[in-house]
Amino acid sequence: MEMKDYIFTSESVSEGHPDKVADQVSDSILDAILAQDPRARVACETLVTTGMAVIAGEITTSAVVDYPKVVRETIREIGYNDSAMGFDWETCAVLVSIDKQSPDISQGVTEGEGMFKEQGAGDQGLMFGYACTETPELMPMSITYAHKLTQKLAEVRKNGVLDFLRPDSKSQVSVEYVDDKPVRVDTVVISSQHTPEVSYEAIKEGIIEEVVKKIIPAHLMDERTRMLINPTGRFVVGGPMGDCGLTGRKIIVDSYGGHGAHGGGAFSGKDPSKVDRSAAYMGRYVAKNLVAAGLCEKCEVQVAYAIGVAEPVSVMVDTAGTGKISSKRIAEIVREVFDLRPRAIIEQLDLLRPIYRKTAAYGHFGRELPEFTWERTDKVYMIRQKAGI
């Protein structure tokens, strides 16, 4: 028997978390390049540690970009503006080591080159998309609230409501399910970096009143809901001084918070010829449209590619038993409605734009911003027609 009553937990981290600082630096560099050269090939990795940021990778572009300036601007916007934090946009060292993309890879993803003349996938690999009916955004409830909590922490820090907060923070939300439906929030964990002089009581009260109660709806909390705020008691040393940060270390935060599967490829710092990013966005677009069309309540889509080959080697749909029609027929509809070749994905989702910095904190999915084209539900009518519902 499948487990129907359970508690499921997801976490999020704020824009000031060291791994997220690295993601945002990588995507800020990608955006700066795409703004000048939309066809650039970018694979940019970032490391941040006490007093230092390192960027390295393979970039082939005609764009002229002041990389250290982009790095510093990003760190400043996040809020590391004081060397007392161990990381400061003005004084940190910035090291740059950039090479060009390998010509062996380039010929596989450049139209008219390689064994297959069409633009092929930038690498082999498997990517997943997911959607469900738990929230209006068609995302799992636990990750939705976890992201909203870390966003709210950043907001009250920047607007001065809780001026003792510093940029590094994390949240975790545990949701109780009864008969496979989310019914209440069981536990909320928040850890936020803060100034040395503030009392624990002020931190706890401020975060509960100005963050938790403003985000988690009252009907989802009860007297049994636990709130664990800075449970170590002190969090002064944080950010890149507390932990070394690296691009691509928060792939579950970036996607579905542990719901569904993950192919293992990170998103940030990669231009859309890399299917790790573009096909994962397409997977979300497909899954969300299938759920929005009413074909299923939960949907996981897997696509897989071979390097240099345009057509996916496989497409799989799993509705966890919630499908109105067979998963086999849904997979056929996916191939009929959506073009899953890399160039077509880039065109359908308009991915050659400098839109990626926004994706690099608070989740790539479930945020209905105008730039997030993969969140549109504009294929619902066509899907319903083909499904005959």
UniProtKB/Swiss-Prot annotation:
Q: How is the co-factor bound, per the entry?
A: Binds 2 divalent ions per subunit.
Recorded E.C. number(s)? 2.5.1.6
A single Gene Ontology biological process assigned to it is: S-adenosylmethionine biosynthetic process
Q: Where in the cell is it found?
A: Cytoplasm
Chain residues that bind Mg(2+): D19
Query: Which chain positions lie within coiled-coil regions?
Result: none
Which pathway does this polypeptide act in? Amino-acid biosynthesis; S-adenosyl-L-methionine biosynthesis; S-adenosyl-L-methionine from L-methionine: step 1/1
Q: Which UniProt keywords apply?
A: ATP-binding, Cytoplasm, Magnesium, Metal-binding, Nucleotide-binding, One-carbon metabolism, Potassium, Transferase
Annotated Gene Ontology cellular components are:
cytoplasm
Supply the InterPro entries for this chain.
Answer: ADOMET_SYNTHASE_CS, S-AdoMet_synt_C, S-AdoMet_synt_central, S-AdoMet_synt_N, S-AdoMet_synthetase, S-AdoMet_synthetase_sfam
Q: Where is this region: Flexible loop?
A: 101-111
Q: Which reaction does it catalyse?
A: L-methionine + ATP + H2O = S-adenosyl-L-methionine + phosphate + diphosphate
Cofactor(s), by name: Mg(2+); K(+)
Which residues are noted in the entry as ATP-binding?
A: H17, D168, S169, K170, R234, F235, D243, R249, K250, A266, K270
Task: Summarize where L-methionine binds, as residue positions.
Answer: E58, Q101, D243, K274
Single GO MF annotation: magnesium ion binding
Q: Which SUPFAM superfamilies match?
A: S-adenosylmethionine synthetase
- Give the binding site residues for K(+): E45
What the record says about family reads: Belongs to the AdoMet synthase family.
| Quaternary structure annotation from Swiss-Prot or TrEMBL | Homotetramer; dimer of dimers.
Briefly state the protein's biological role.
Catalyzes the formation of S-adenosylmethionine (AdoMet) from methionine and ATP. The overall synthetic reaction is composed of two sequential steps, AdoMet formation and the subsequent tripolyphosphate hydrolysis which occurs prior to release of AdoMet from the enzyme.
Its recorded name reads: S-adenosylmethionine synthase
Q: Which gene encodes it?
A: metK
